[in-house]
Amino acid sequence: MTDRAAGPHPLAALTLARFKLTIREPEMVFWVFVFPIVLALALGLAFQTRGEEPVPVAVRDMPGAAPVLAALEQAGGLEAFVTPGEDEAVLLRDGGAHLVVVPGSPPTYRYDAARPESRLARVLVDGALAGAAGHRPPWTARTEEVATPGSRYIDWLIPGLLGMNVMGSSMWGIGFGIVVARSRKLLKRMIATPMRRSHFLASLVLSRLAFLAVEMLALLAFAAWVFGVGNQGGLAALAAVALTGALAFGGIGLLTGSRARTIEGVSGIMNFMMLPMWICSGVFFAVTNFPEAVQPFIRLLPLTALIDALRGVMLNGEALAGVGAELGVLTAWGAVSFALALRVFRWQ
């Protein structure tokens, strides 16, 4: 009785034991202490308070453009520039210009009335031209409302969700599957077979491609049916980009699962790799929200390259040559990851 009374209380001893077990798990320490700080830092950098940015307005390059451009440049809050007529649709779609002024008497405003920033641009341009005349002009500008395919947020979001789906499906389906097989001693049994490691690892990648094709088609069909999201570049180019991305993330998944011993371990490693890309790679908001100093590094992330290539095809109608830089980044990630996975992979 005396010894028991002198020792620690059972509740205190059990609590201390659970605390020690928790802090010995690196994954738990990361999610509890590190991840909230990383998340706050990333989102704080992306949405930090900035000064008021000027509204981009294009002036069609034609007779009469010079005085219009001068009036807009003198007004506050506008960033005016001259553009040839053939570039107007791309500028309006991508946000390079919120409104296009066609010089004339009266001038014509080309803009997408469904976009709030375009409606604001019209008000600012009206005020700038009235101020240049010294009074309210005796004319009312003509308006030419244009519907720019791919200019809605949902059009911009769907390629990001496709890229995120490719990354998650490839990495979890391959890396997690390897660790599960290892924990169940299935890989150990394969040592006695004449199977080559490269064939085994390649089979994991190829099997995931079949599932990925179904997943992508389902999301594309849903987006087209419910929201009217289109694909300007065609299914062949989109499939080629998705395939390159799947192979790249498949190689990364192989690498993460090649040495991990436990399911908890591989889960922590994959979440550590994927969550920063979910935040930084432009899935839900543009990479340009981040400071310019870090944007070159973000552009080198595989998910950033994949999403940029998907958006280039779906929104801009780019051919594969137009997204060659992004495909090169993905190919490099896949080749290096797969080569390293072959070197470090172990059966037990």
Spell out what each predicted region is.
Residues 38-39, 149-225, 277:
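Hydrophobic alpha-helical transmembrane segments of multi-pass membrane transport proteins
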Residues 98, 147-151, 281-336:
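Membrane-interfacial helix-loop-helix junctions in multi-pass membrane proteins
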Residues 1-154, 322-325:
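Extracytoplasmic/periplasmic domains immediately adjacent to an N-terminal transmembrane anchor
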Residues 197-270, 275, 320-327, 331-339:
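Alpha-helical transmembrane segments and their short interhelical loops
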Residues 8, 12, 16-23, 277, ...:
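Membrane-interacting alpha-helical segments
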Residues 34-37, 41-53, 259-300, 304:
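Transmembrane helix segments
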Residues 45, 180, 189, 193, ...:
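Transmembrane helix-loop junction
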Residues 43-51, 175, 180, 223-231, ...:
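Short helix-capping/hinge motifs at transmembrane helix termini and TM-loop junctions
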